[in-house]
């Protein structure tokens, strides 16, 4: 889908009603006769500690999923029996108008959001009481610790603080066309920003210049929020997976790993590129880069509905082992290396994660207690459904803190040639990350940022 296509999709309203119906269906899979209301609250305005400025606002994702509303201090009710939704927005505060202008009106909110009715927040408890009295056998479905003290469910026979969150987490895994368009837009803006980063390589003298270049392009193209703090890691710092200092000088460094993604109306992009600061990969850097690129390309190629993500992650390790054997860092039998889990010294993280309103989106069913170190940090376990969006982000890293115990352990050290390894420490780490939409018969790569060696070197050099 080209840019014009996703822009056309985004002219419509965020499809919150269809999301609500999907969530109700999921609740009824576990509670067949579920009736009553879904109740959600937005994030509330909160001041910084010892300050009269508000904290940076980040909307609750569960609330946004059923409303498409990015305002603070709001409430939402969905009446299961009538399939009608009500959004509650704050009334006019004359003091606030002086500083911030008029807030959204009821009529404007009805035009903007996919809801059946809009009321003022002052009407919330009366509306709850009316709905509870109209159906005494009903249940109020809400999320634990996300109900304000002044809100009452007295007229409802039951309260359930588990089912709603669980249902939304499952529902969010499969994206509809509008949600995919949001992620496409986030990728589109992020691609522009990543290209600006590549173009900065020949003149930059500090990591922070890459962060600045990325942020400037995103904001200029309408994405004022980042999906996460950008990572601009040069040299050996690239072996730190979530390095966010972004303050080191570039002198004497071979490569830069840029992991950054814009957010578009609460939907994330998550893209990583690694490139040579000189415009030309060193011999060792290119060897590692080509291994990681093969890992990514081969793993993406097998993706489609129903594929077991554990198997794709395992494939990445097999390709990494083959590659590291070919350049001499690893030695011995590849099956024994895999069985011993020695490759985890160089690829310690999972191959990817679901992507959506959160960078590490819901529904992955990770098992961080897994005794198998190869799978412990795999954020998605199970089969991939059509409509899910997942990152594919293999990497090879040379982190002394992680690798040193392997060199001291005879189970692993027999598979590692430390003399060859010593040539690669300055490579730091290489990661390549794209955002992939799973389809019934295959996949679509939503990320268009260049990653082939020749493309990368040309963009940096020019």
From Swiss-Prot:
Please name the Pfam families in this protein's record.
AMP_N, Peptidase_M24
Tell me yes or no: is Ligase among this UniProt entry's keywords.
Answer: no
Which domain of life, per UniProt? Answer: Eukaryota
A GO biological process of this protein is: proteolysis
Q: Kindly state which keywords UniProt assigns to this record, in alphabetical order.
A: Aminopeptidase, Hydrolase, Manganese, Metal-binding, Metalloprotease, Protease
Q: What's the record's note on cofactor binding?
A: Binds 2 manganese ions per subunit.
Q: Which cofactor does it need?
A: Mn(2+)
Recorded catalytic reaction(s): these are: Release of any N-terminal amino acid, including proline, that is linked to proline, even from a dipeptide or tripeptide
Q: Which residues of the sequence carry a binding annotation for Mn(2+) 2?
A: 259, 270, 433
Molecular function in Gene Ontology:
manganese ion binding; metalloaminopeptidase activity
* Residue sites binding Mn(2+) 1 per the record: 270, 393, 433
Question: InterPro entries in the record, alphabetically?
Answer: Aminopep_P_N, Creatin/AminoP/Spt16_N, Creatinase/aminopeptidase-like, Pept_M24, X-Pro_dipept-like
Q: EC number(s) in its UniProt entry?
A: 3.4.11.9
Q: Would you identify the family this protein belongs to, as annotated?
A: Belongs to the peptidase M24B family.
| Function, as annotated | Catalyzes the removal of a penultimate prolyl residue from the N-termini of peptides.
Stored PANTHER family: XAA-PRO AMINOPEPTIDASE 3, XAA-PRO DIPEPTIDASE
Name listed for the protein in its UniProt record:
Probable Xaa-Pro aminopeptidase NECHADRAFT_60613
Q: Which organism is it from?
A: Fusarium vanettenii (strain ATCC MYA-4622 / CBS 123669 / FGSC 9596 / NRRL 45880 / 77-13-4) (Fusarium solani subsp. pisi)
List the lineage, top down: Eukaryota, Fungi, Dikarya, Ascomycota, Pezizomycotina
């Amino acid at each position: 889908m080209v840019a014009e296509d996703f822009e056309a999709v985004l002219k419509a309203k965020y499809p919150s009603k269809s999301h609500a119906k999907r969530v109700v269906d999921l609740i009824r899979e576990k509670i067949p006769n579920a009736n009553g209301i879904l109740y959600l609250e937005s994030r509330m305005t909160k001041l910084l500690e010892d300050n009269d400025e508000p904290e940076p606002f980040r909307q609750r994702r569960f609330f946004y999923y059923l409303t498409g509303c990015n305002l603070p201090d709001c409430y939402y009710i969905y009446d299961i029996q009538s399939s009608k939704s009500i959004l509650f927005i704050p009334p006019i505060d004359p003091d606030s108008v002086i500083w911030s202008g008029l807030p959204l009106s009821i009529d404007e909110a009805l035009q903007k959001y996919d809801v059946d009715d809009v009321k003022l927040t002052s009407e919330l408890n009366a509306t709850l009481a009316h709905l509870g009295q109209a159906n005494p056998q009903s249940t109020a479905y809400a999320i634990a610790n996300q109900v304000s003290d002044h809100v009452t469910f007295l007229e409802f026979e039951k309260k359930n603080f588990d089912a709603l969150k669980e249902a939304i987490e499952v529902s969010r895994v499969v994206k509809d066309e509008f949600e995919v368009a949001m992620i496409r837009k986030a990728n589109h803006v992020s691609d522009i920003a990543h290209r600006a980063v590549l173009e900065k390589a020949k003149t930059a003298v500090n990591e922070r210049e890459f962060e600045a270049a990325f942020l400037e392009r995103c904001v200029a193209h309408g994405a004022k929020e980042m999906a996460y703090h950008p990572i601009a890691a040069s040299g050996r710092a690239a072996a730190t997976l979530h390095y966010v200092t972004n303050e080191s000088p570039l002198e004497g460094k071979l490569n830069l790993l840029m992991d950054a993604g814009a957010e578009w109306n609460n939907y994330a992009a998550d893209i990583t590129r690694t490139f040579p600061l000189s415009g030309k990969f060193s011999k060792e850097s290119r060897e590692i880069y080509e291994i990681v690129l093969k890992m990514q390309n081969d793993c993406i190629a097998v993706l489609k509905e129903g594929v077991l993500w554990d198997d794709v992650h395992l494939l990445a390790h097999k390709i990494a082992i083959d590659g590291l054997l070919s350049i001499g860092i690893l030695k011995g039998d590849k099956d024994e290396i895999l069985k011993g889990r020695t490759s985890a010294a160089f690829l310690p993280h999972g191959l990817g994660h679901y992507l959506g309103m959160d960078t590490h989106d819901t529904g992955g069913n990770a098992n961080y207690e897994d005794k198998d170190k190869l799978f412990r940090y795999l954020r998605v376990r199970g089969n991939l459904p059509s409509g899910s969006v997942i990152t594919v982000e293999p990497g090879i890293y040379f982190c002394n803190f992680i690798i040193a115990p392997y060199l001291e352990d005879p189970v692993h050290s027999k598979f590692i040639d430390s003399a060859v390894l010593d040539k690669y420490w300055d490579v730091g780490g290489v990661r390549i990350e794209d955002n992939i939409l799973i389809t019934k018969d295959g996949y679509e790569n939503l990320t268009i940022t260049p990653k082939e060696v020749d493309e990368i070197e040309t963009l940096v050099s020019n």
